[in-house]
């Protein structure tokens, strides 16, 4: 059963992580124009940056979930050393428990191509039948996740040394997406027209957010946005984060920008009485906000080493808070 649980955990991670058919930058031809939300991550680019390498190592060290995943997929890691190069996930809507329907691509090398055999071996060891099925002439794997009501389906594409897993919670979509990857014809969906800046590690886009359930409130905040796009990365030792929202009301974009500027100014005034806020406001001078032609743009560029220092501080403080919390519980138990 431990191996079966590991496969379920692996399937759950794939839902969260997503993946790309072509190593970054994103190949828009692999994402249909019907995709209302898209997320793309270039793990190779991330591992080459100060911040990305730290976060990948931290996830590897701290994630208890990896212990279960590795029962089914030995050596699994999100770092490129595990064979994964990049990730893309997209869909049309979100429900309360996440994407209602999604397609994900995981791009990598021959190491991830071995996952199928590893899944079968783990199932046999757990006393279960092979998870393989056939759909429209393609070999696919069906893996039930822990809630028992959902099955994740996946098929493997190979071209030279490259491997791509096509994953979905809909069996038919797995076959359709695999054919789409092979033939192309997409435009990038919600990331259509958003250029891949050198050094980009991750991009996310939402098209018509008012029609994507979990983005309703966000859309109201930025003036009934028609689209939201953002990217983060690191280039030549500089961390950057950029976001753009195209609104329905061109005249309102400048007003929204002024409101955001006002929040930054308010933070500057309040920081003298709040050490935590003061620490964050050290970076405020690197934040630029503008509104023009119906678009609100927010950009942040700062020395990557200093940003990494802040991330490490916050991580250490979070671990310290957890230790204090559990230590307090233990003390209470000793008093009883």
Q: Whereabouts are the PLM-identified features?
A:
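Intrinsically disordered, low-complexity segments enriched in Gly and acidic/Ser/Thr residues
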Residues: 221-291
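Broad, structure-driven detector of short, well-ordered beta-strand segments within folded domains
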Residues: 85-92, 150-158, 220, 226-234
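Beta-strand elements of well-folded, non-transmembrane domains
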Residues: 45, 108, 234, 245-251, ...
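A short, solvent-exposed beta-edge/loop patch
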Residues: 39, 143-182, 233-238, 288-306
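Bacterial N-terminal signal peptides that target proteins for export
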Residues: 1-10
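A conserved glycine-rich beta-strand in the N-terminal activation segment of trypsin-fold
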Residues: 151-218, 222
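Bacterial N-terminal signal peptides
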Residues: 9-18
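Structural boundary/hinge residues at secondary-structure and domain interfaces
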Residues: 22-142, 147, 194-221, 258-283, ...
């Amino acid at each position: 059963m431990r191996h079966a649980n590991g496969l379920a955990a692996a399937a759950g991670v794939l839902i969260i992580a997503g993946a790309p058919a072509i190593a970054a930058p994103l190949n828009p031809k692999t994402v249909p124009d019907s995709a209302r939300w898209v997320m793309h991550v270039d793990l190779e680019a991330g591992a080459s940056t100060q911040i990305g390498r730290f976060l990948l190592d931290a996830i590897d060290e701290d994630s208890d979930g990896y212990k279960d995943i590795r029962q089914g997929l030995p050596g699994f890691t999100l770092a490129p050393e595990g064979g994964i190069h990049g990730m893309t996930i997209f869909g049309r809507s979100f429900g309360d428990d996440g994407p209602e329907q999604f397609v994900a691509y995981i791009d990598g090398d021959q190491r991830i191509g071995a996952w199928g055999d590893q899944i079968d071996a783990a199932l046999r060891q757990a006393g279960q039948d092979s998870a393989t099925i056939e759909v429209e002439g393609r070999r696919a794997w069906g893996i039930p996740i822990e809630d028992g009501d959902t099955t994740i389906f996946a098929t493997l594409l190979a071209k030279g040394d490259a491997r791509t897993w096509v994953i979905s919670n809909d069996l038919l979509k797995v076959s359709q997406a695999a054919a789409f990857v092979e033939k192309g014809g997409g435009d990038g969906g919600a990331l259509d027209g958003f250029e891949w800046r050198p050094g980009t590690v991750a991009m996310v886009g939402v098209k018509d957010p008012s029609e994507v359930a979990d983005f309703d409130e966000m859309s109201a905040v930025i003036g009934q946005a028609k689209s939201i796009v953002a990217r983060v990365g690191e280039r030549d030792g500089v961390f950057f984060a950029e976001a753009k929202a195209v609104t329905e009301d061109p005249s309102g974009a400048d007003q929204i920008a002024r409101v955001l500027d006002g929040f930054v100014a308010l933070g500057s005034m309040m920081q003298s009485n709040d050490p935590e806020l003061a620490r964050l406001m050290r970076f405020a001078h690197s934040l630029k906000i503008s509104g023009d032609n119906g678009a609100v743009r927010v950009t942040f560029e700062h020395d990557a080493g200093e940003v990494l220092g802040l991330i490490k501080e916050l991580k250490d403080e979070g671990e310290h808070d957890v230790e204090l919390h559990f230590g307090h519980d233990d003390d209470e138990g000793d008093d009883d």
